[in-house]
Every structure is written in structure tokens, then in C-alpha cells.
């Protein structure tokens, strides 16, 4: 454990107000190791002065590597790319929200297209399917030298690598979902700067020192010709360390970094005096230097990890086109990084969803399986099962609304509760499922006391119930103040449950008014108060949706929802195009394939 601790990081909320009729425009694009034997080498810090010429060697597929004359900084991969995703969450091993879902779903989709893909995340728990590689490296964290180890498993065509260190395992063990960033919701670990500095350095070592042989197509270390995809502020040091520790010593000269913003409200702002803890040259200080205009836990001049990640990376991406448009539109929407993003530009690509876990035809949590041809017969039966499960009067004719999400201001759960009091007098039932802030949990649990035959609030983490609500509800309410992409609406549409959503971020990109759902308009993102205008938007839109319930038009909307392509296949193609644009000479676009890589060995852990 490092002896120096850092200050708290804070959360900043954007303040978004959208015109839902505005034209959606495409956001512009901007334009160290010692040689090791097997899996048992220890890589010293001073080994950065040496480099290995080891290249990835294929087992079954040819992979010609030729240099393009005059392009020494161009990645040379032959066919496919070497992609390294780095993040603090990767589903299903660790997940608190959309970040874990993306790192769980996008990498297999890219692997299925013929690329070699690795994910790197902390080992928060003793994952039973990940084995110790026996490879250890040393990294400098603050003023101490720390040894980290790597665990590995190979699933769905992806090398899943986990960074093992007490900073992760001893804090979080046993309760990954609730303790990744702090001991409880809203409270962060004091040493998060050090924890994620360690993660970034370990991630830069892994492609070069891990001799992985689980794939039918690739073997050996990934080498130095790689593309790093850094996700959110926790990994923003990757481009900085890449330049200062590696490329300055002639290592990773061809490597590039794409930085993906999943939620700009979380930026990693710390006291300016903490910069020396990062062990970066002074030339990087300007990229971190930041003075905010809001009242924040850390007073005065600060460092901003996300700002540095944006400025030092080769490409900036976010999780939907409309969210990208919001981020560059104003200081409140970009949470004071709008001007930086306008300078660098940002690309939005909508997320996909896990169509294997969320599949009404095979869902293990529902008694009735269905598809688009049988949905109209199945939904009433599933509604009755849901009503019985939560203790509401069983009546397949009454419209039922669901809400699934974190109980916090961003997700609009406080606005929802205020609105329920207004529309509960209509012919409707509602089931609310979520965990989060205690005051919000108490509010939803009071719903069944106030409206015993109309409402049910469940303040627990309950995966089976989430699936039952998604399948059995007629509508899914998504009242987010801001939503970079959102997954609940995708799950709902997959099951023929019509979204009623706020008009923000990815909700604008994925839900079509009157075709696959109902838009309520944009909400005031000031989190300290519930705006009566937003409550009215929910009430009026719910009434509008209920007026359509049971009609032929509603049946058509259900089928429209289920006809949408929601998997990771299309997003993976767009990600592939973007990453190829970073200069992967000799690489080729992938091929059509299933989300599980064809012929890949499944569930193979490193021996």
C-alpha cells in the first residue's frame, strides 16, 4: 500500500436543456520490458530502458507484418488490430453501470470481427474463472514501489486480464458492486488517485509481458503495436504514461490511445498539489491544470484527469452522437470541459446491449418465452406473473409501468416519485426497482404504503425481478436528467416494453417518438431541487401513453421496438472504422460474425 494518500475526488453534474426538435448533426472527428521467459518474469522499473522485439505469432491464421515506407509511427498489424480496453469495470465480473456493460459487450463483438482483443481491469474479488499468470511487474505509485500481478481468463474470444493488488482486492473483496470507488455510495476512497495510477501503469505493461496462448488464432504477447481504449477519468493517465515512460524511451512508438467518455459528470478533479503523486514530468502539468466555476469539495486550483485524457489522447469518443452534441454545446452541458472538447472534437457511437442475457426467447428468469410473433400473447401472462410476484392485484388489462435504475438524481428517481403522486389516480400500476441513496430508497418503499393496490417499490438489488419487470411491464419509465447512452430503454425495447423517456443523450438516439416510444422532453439537470415543470412532463406523457395503450397503434409500437437492431454488431463496426482511422497500416476491416467469436475456445483460464 502506498504511503501517500490523495484527496477525495468529486462528482460534477452537467446542466442540460435540450430542444428535442433540434437537428442531430454528426460530430466532427479529430482528425519497457526485459525479455521474459514463459509466465514467470518480474519486470523491474529500470527495465524500461530495455525493450523486447517479441511479436505476436499466429497459430492458425497468417498475419503478415510489413512496414509502410516513411510511416514509422504507423501501426503495422497485417490483418486485424491488437486492441486493449482498460477500465475500472468489466461485466460480469465488476459492474455498477454502463461502463461495465460496455467493456463486457463491445470487446467480444470486435473479437468476432477478427481482431485480437484484451480487457484490463482491477481484480476486486477472487474471481473463480480467472487464474494467476505468475507474472508480476513493479510500478511506482506516489513515492513507493508496488508489485502487481496479473490474473487471466479467455472468454468469448477476449483475453480478460485482471490487475491484482491490495489497493483493489482488500478494499472491495466480496462486495464488488458497491465498493469499487468508495466504502459506500457517495463516499470515495482517499487514495483513488493512487489506485488508478497503478491501474494505468499495469495496463501499459500487460500487452508486453503476458504470454497468452488461449486463442486458436493468436499466441504470445500482444507486443507494442497496439491500440489502447481508455475508459473514463480513471484511465486518463494512460496516454500520459505512454508518452512519458515509454515512447520517450523508444517503446510503444506505434501505439495510439482512444479515450472514451462514458459520463462527463465524473472527471477526477483533485487538489493541484497532488500532481507530483502522478510521477509525470512538469510538461504535462498544463494538461491537468484546471479551475472550475462551481462549488466543489476540492477548493481552488485543481488537476483534472479527464481534461488530460482528452488532450493527450489521439481520439476522443463518447457513447452516443446526441450526448457528443450536448457536451460541446455549452459550459453546463460539457461540465466545464466543453471548450476543451470543441478544440479536440469528439465522436459519438451508440452502445449496444447483451442480446444473450437479455433475450425474451431464452430468458431464464421468466416463465413464458416469446419473440416478435408471440409477444402479444405472452405479455399479458408475464404481467400477471409480475403482479403476483410483487403483491399487486392481478389484472392483465390494467396498464403497468416499470422503472429500473439507480436511485439518484441523475436517473431522476426523485422526479419520478413526485410525479407518481400526480398520476397514480389514473388506471395504472407501477413497479419501481432500484438501490441508491437512502432517502430515495425510503421514498419508493413508502409507495406501497400510500397506494397498496397501485404501486410497489423494491429497494434491493434483484436481477430476477429486473427481468420480470422488463418482460411484464407495458411501459418503461426513463426520467433521467442526463443520460450519456442508457441501457434500460434498450432492454425494454428488446422485450417489447415501450419506453417513456426524457429527451437527453442516448435516449434521443435510440427511442423514436411515436414509433418505438414516447419522449417527455429535456429535464432541468439541477440536482438539488425537483422542478415542477419536469414533474408535469412525466404526468402529461404518461397520460399520453396510457391513451394509446390497448390500441392497434400500441401493438405496432411493441413490434417496432422488438424489430430494432440493438446488439453490439453495428456499434462494433463503427468502433472498428474509428480505430482503423488511427493509422493501423496493413489492417483490414473485420468480417461478419456472431458476438461470440467463431471457433474460439470458451471459458479457458490460463493454466
Curated annotation (Swiss-Prot):
Its main location: plastid. One of its GO terms (biological process) is starch biosynthetic process. Keywords: Amyloplast, Chloroplast, Glycosyltransferase, Plastid, Starch biosynthesis, Transferase, Transit peptide. Residues 1-77 form a transit peptide. It comes from the Eukaryota. The keyword Lipid biosynthesis does not apply. GO terms for molecular function: alpha-1,4-glucan glucosyltransferase (UDP-glucose donor) activity. It holds the Pfam family Glycos_transf_1. ADP-alpha-D-glucose binds at residue 95. Residues 585-607 are annotated as: Disordered. One of its GO terms (cellular component) is chloroplast starch grain. It catalyses: an NDP-alpha-D-glucose + [(1->4)-alpha-D-glucosyl](n) = [(1->4)-alpha-D-glucosyl](n+1) + a ribonucleoside 5'-diphosphate + H(+). It is found in: Plastid, Chloroplast; Plastid, Amyloplast. Pathway: Glycan biosynthesis; starch biosynthesis. Its EC number is 2.4.1.242. PANTHER family: GRANULE-BOUND STARCH SYNTHASE 1, CHLOROPLASTIC/AMYLOPLASTIC (PTHR45825), GRANULE-BOUND STARCH SYNTHASE 1, CHLOROPLASTIC_AMYLOPLASTIC (PTHR45825:SF3). Belongs to the glycosyltransferase 1 family. Bacterial/plant glycogen synthase subfamily. This is Granule-bound starch synthase 1, chloroplastic/amyloplastic. It comes from Solanum tuberosum (Potato). The lineage of its organism: Eukaryota, Viridiplantae, Streptophyta, Embryophyta, Tracheophyta.
Amino acid at each position: 500500500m502506498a504511503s501517500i494518500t490523495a484527496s477525495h475526488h468529486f462528482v460534477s453534474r452537467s446542466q442540460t436543456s435540450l430542444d428535442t426538435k433540434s437537428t442531430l448533426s454528426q460530430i466532427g472527428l479529430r482528425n519497457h520490458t526485459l525479455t521474459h521467459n514463459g509466465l514467470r518474469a518480474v519486470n523491474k522499473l529500470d527495465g524500461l530502458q530495455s525493450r523486447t522485439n517479441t511479436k505476436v505469432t499466429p497459430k492458425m491464421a497468417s498475419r503478415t507484418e510489413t512496414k509502410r515506407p516513411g510511416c514509422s509511427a504507423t501501426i503495422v498489424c497485417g490483418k486485424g488490430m491488437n486492441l486493449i480496453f482498460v477500465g475500472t469495470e468489466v461485466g460480469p465480473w465488476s459492474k455498477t453501470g454502463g461502463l461495465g456493460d460496455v467493456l463486457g459487450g463491445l470487446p467480444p463483438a470486435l473479437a468476432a470481427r477478427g481482431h485480437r482483443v484484451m480487457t484490463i481491469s482491477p481484480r476486486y474479488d477472487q474471481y473463480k474463472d480467472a487464474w494467476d499468470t505468475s507474472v508480476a511487474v513493479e510500478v511506482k505509485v506516489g513515492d513507493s514501489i508496488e508489485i502487481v500481478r496479473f490474473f487471466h481468463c479467455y472468454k468469448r474470444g477476449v483475453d480478460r486480464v485482471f490487475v491484482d493488488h491490495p489497493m483493489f482486492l482488500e478494499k472491495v473483496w466480496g462486495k464488488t458492486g458497491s465498493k469499487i470507488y468508495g466504502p459506500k455510495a457517495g463516499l470515495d476512497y482517499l487514495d483513488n488517485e493512487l489506485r488508478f495510477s497503478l491501474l494505468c501503469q499495469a495496463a501499459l505493461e500487460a500487452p508486453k509481458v503476458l504470454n497468452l496462448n488461449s486463442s486458436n488464432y493468436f499466441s504470445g504477447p500482444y507486443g507494442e503495436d497496439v491500440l489502447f481504449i481508455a475508459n473514463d477519468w480513471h484511465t486518463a493517465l494512460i496516454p500520459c504514461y505512454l508518452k512519458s515512460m515509454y515512447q520517450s524511451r523508444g517503446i510503444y512508438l506505434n501505439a495510439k490511445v482512444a479515450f472514451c467518455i462514458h459520463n462527463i459528470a465524473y472527471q477526477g478533479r483533485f487538489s493541484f498539489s497532488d500532481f507530483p503523486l502522478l510521477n509525470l514530468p512538469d510538461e504535462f502539468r498544463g494538461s491537468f491544470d484546471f479551475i472550475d466555476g462551481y462549488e466543489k469539495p476540492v477548493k481552488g486550483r485543481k488537476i483534472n484527469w479527464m481534461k488530460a485524457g482528452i488532450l493527450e489522447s489521439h481520439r476522443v469518443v463518447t457513447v452516443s452522437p446526441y450526448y457528443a452534441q450536448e457536451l460541446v454545446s455549452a459550459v453546463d452541458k460539457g461540465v466545464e470541459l466543453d471548450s476543451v472538447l470543441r478544440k479536440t472534437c469528439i465522436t459519438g457511437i451508440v452502445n449496444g446491449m447483451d442480446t444473450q442475457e437479455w433475450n425474451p426467447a431464452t430468458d431464464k428468469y421468466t416463465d413464458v418465452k416469446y419473440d416478435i410473433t408471440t409477444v402479444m400473447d405472452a405479455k399479458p401472462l408475464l404481467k400477471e406473473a409480475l403482479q403476483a410476484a410483487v403483491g399487486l392485484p392481478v389484472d392483465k388489462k390494467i396498464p403497468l409501468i416499470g422503472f429500473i435504475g439507480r436511485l439518484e438524481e441523475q436517473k431522476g428517481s426523485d422526479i419520478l416519485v413526485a410525479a407518481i403522486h400526480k398520476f397514480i389516480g389514473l388506471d395504472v400500476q407501477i413497479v419501481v426497482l432500484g438501490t441508491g441513496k437512502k432517502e430515495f430508497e425510503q421514498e419508493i418503499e413508502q409507495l406501497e404504503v400510500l397506494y397498496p393496490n397501485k404501486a410497489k417499490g423494491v429497494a434491493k438489488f434483484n436481477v430476477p425481478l429486473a427481468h420480470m419487470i422488463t418482460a411484464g411491464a407495458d411501459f418503461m419509465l426513463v426520467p433521467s436528467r442526463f443520460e450519456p447512452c442508457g441501457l434500460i430503454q434498450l432492454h425494454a425495447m428488446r422485450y417489447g416494453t415501450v419506453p417513456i423517456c426524457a429527451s437527453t443523450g442516448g435516449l434521443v438516439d435510440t427511442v423514436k417518438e411515436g414509433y418505438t416510444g414516447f419522449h417527455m422532453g429535456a429535464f432541468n439537470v439541477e440536482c438539488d431541487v425537483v422542478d415542477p415543470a419536469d414533474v408535469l412532463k412525466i404526468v402529461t406523457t404518461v397520460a399520453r401513453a396510457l391513451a394509446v395503450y390497448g390500441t392497434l397503434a400500441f401493438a405496432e409500437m411493441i413490434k417496432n421496438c422488438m424489430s430494432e437492431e440493438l446488439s453490439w454488431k453495428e456499434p462494433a463496426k463503427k468502433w472498428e472504422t474509428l480505430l482503423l482511422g488511427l493509422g493501423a497500416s496493413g489492417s483490414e476491416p473485420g468480417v461478419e460474425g456472431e458476438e461470440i467469436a467463431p471457433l474460439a475456445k470458451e471459458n479457458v483460464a490460463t493454466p
